[in-house]
Amino acid sequence: MSIENLKNSLPEYAKDLKLNLSSIARSTVLNEQQLWGTLLASAAATRSATTLREIAEEAADVLSAEAYNAALGAASIMGMNNVFYRGKAFLGGRYDDLRAGLRMQIIGNPGVDKADFELWSFAVSSINGCAHCLEAHEHTLREAGVSREVIFESLRVAAIVAGVGQAVQSTEALAAAAV
């Protein structure tokens, strides 16, 4: 199992992450598509090739092809949107009257349940640190009737995967440097 491979690759100092990853992979708060889509989108957002490969391998066995692509699509489109809207927010409203002019059709037609896509976008926005997008996706999820518990669990998944990605990158960098 690839989650097992990922857990086994974590060093002793990341024991909490190993335990959290075990726990979150068995979440009953999220349905299977929500969980594995959030895991996959979050892994893509970490920019850790190993984390993405290991989670993607298992996600491919669980998710439909449409959900797999939509989760990666959420990570990709949020990679653009989070930079744009976070940057725009730093400018203190001086550009709020200008149109974004960015193509974002996947958000309107993700190929899966829109609430699931929003959940994955919410998770990625938390990893990428965009308060504007995080709040917008949370609002859309609440309007769609998604419970606070489901939204919060998605945030937990994102946090754990982000921490795992950081630990994996540190471990790989130190191994490459023979430290």
Curated annotation (Swiss-Prot):
State the EC number(s): 1.11.1.28
Which terms does the record give in the GO molecular function aspect? Answer: alkyl hydroperoxide reductase activity; disulfide oxidoreductase activity; hydroperoxide reductase activity; peroxiredoxin activity
Keywords assigned: Antioxidant, Disulfide bond, Oxidoreductase, Peroxidase, Redox-active center
UniProt GO BP: cell redox homeostasis; response to oxidative stress
Q: Which domain of life is it from?
A: Bacteria
Q: Where is the active site?
A: 130 (proton donor), 133 (cysteine sulfenic acid (-soh) intermediate)
Function, as annotated:
Antioxidant protein with alkyl hydroperoxidase activity. Required for the reduction of the AhpC active site cysteine residues and for the regeneration of the AhpC enzyme activity.
Assembly, in brief, is:
Homotrimer.
Q: From the Swiss-Prot or TrEMBL record, give the protein name.
A: Alkyl hydroperoxide reductase AhpD
